[in-house]
Amino acid sequence: MTLILLPPSEGKTGRARGRSVDLESLSFPELNPTREAVLDTLAKVSASGDAFGVLGVGPSLAHEVERNIHWRTEPAVPASELYSGVLYDALGYATLSPGSKRRANSRLLVVSGAWGALRMGDRVPPYRLSMATTLPGLGPLASVWRDPLRASLDAAVGKSVIVDCRSSTYAAAWRPADELAAKWVAVSVVRERGGVRSVVSHNAKHTRGLVARYLLESGKDPGTPKALQKLIGEQWHAELDRTGAGWTLTVVEHD
């Protein structure tokens, strides 16, 4: 089964009413001790005078920082609704066919600075926390999550091809190693104009969302990086290169 890794969006969509988070109902419950340590520390930081500086946000996001304080009681929403923005708009979970949604629920994993890893059906409250954050008493979040995620995700991957649509900030928290790396494919997006290639961040997020949607809608399960390249190549110009322990699939868009 193909596994697709996504980053969270910065913005989150919440609800005014609803049940609060039930930690035991979340995927990867073995991550709960780390989740609670991170979120309780986040709540303390968010209630302090240093909140904006530690979290790297401005006063205009004060309402989002305030929600961090009440993470245990805020209404929880499915990850499929929680995350928004360019990548998730392109993915378009709400408009997937029933079969594609079932595949999304089992194949999509969001790597999160607050929750470690989530599936689409996991219900959590909105939060404001980047994986690039260093929390007092815990340290850099990518380091905090590295060992717990390795234990959980290494087991979850099995023999799957791993399609990595994360940014480098979130990839730092977990990178497949050893034999798992042989099926780890990071998706890169470049724009080619007049023979010159460049990376456009907004465009790259959009295309990664489209790639994830295409994989879900295809109903196919490429068993190797080369089979993945062939499948993506039906829709885009795609180049596959071995990069270190894993692979990079470069999607080339032409102007």
Describe the residue ranges of each PLM region.
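A glycine-rich, hydrophobic loop/mini-helix early in the fold
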Residues: 51-126
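Generic hydrophobic, helix-prone segments enriched in Leu/Val/Ile
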Residues: 37-42, 64-65, 228, 232
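N-terminal "assembly arms/tails" that initiate or stabilize quaternary assembly
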Residues: 1-61
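Generic signal for short, ordered secondary-structure residues
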Residues: 17, 67-70, 90, 190, ...
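Generic preference for well-ordered secondary structure
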Residues: 22, 26, 67, 71-75, ...
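Internal, well-folded beta-alpha domain core
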Residues: 93-255
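A broad, low-specificity signal marking well-ordered, structured residues that form hydrophobic/aromatic
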Residues: 4, 86, 185
